[in-house]
């Protein structure tokens, strides 16, 4: 299922479900203290790059709630990057396959059952533009539901059942925004966690097996043996925008950059996804 179809489903059915669930939330809401945080579910569905930016958030969770078990919910295509970053054990990863409407519905029902079985008490919804993530946070049954909310600003309607609403700040890096979501769990301000948070987490470390390193060295050796890059620095460029081509530079800009790098003595290689091939 392409991105346009996903957006259409999210806009039509997602908006309706968000409004319905908001009515249930109004009837069930009761004031009270923050429940104990024992089981956290982090929802970050579609953005592979956001998982890298979420490193500081997972560091903050581990430091602030060291005895808490953490699970993640993502789209199936991003499972590999989470395994590489090793945020949580593979057994604590819940995955949804959005490749078709049937697999999407089937996996949502399965994940719904899993969430109810695990009994999460806290859900951190890291999405900005998905209604499905806020719906899943409601279906989880968690008492604490943290997520971005426009408050008085214009923004995507994602329901009113996020009971730890965080105001998104476009002037702060998203990695800092993710840490703010963790701080909002026990925040008493309105909006939640308004103060500037400190982010001191080191860059994420990736563990690569010796066999993978050897395989890549062999590929590069084949490239070098052709004499093309002998004695020159190799610069890899990804000129595509993935599922959102609007993010990509114009192709002419990549061409000029490549020409400048070659002029400086570098060897330029082009990388990309299978669907990027002409």
Language-model features and meaning:
Residues 1-278:
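Catalytic machinery of carbohydrate-active enzymes
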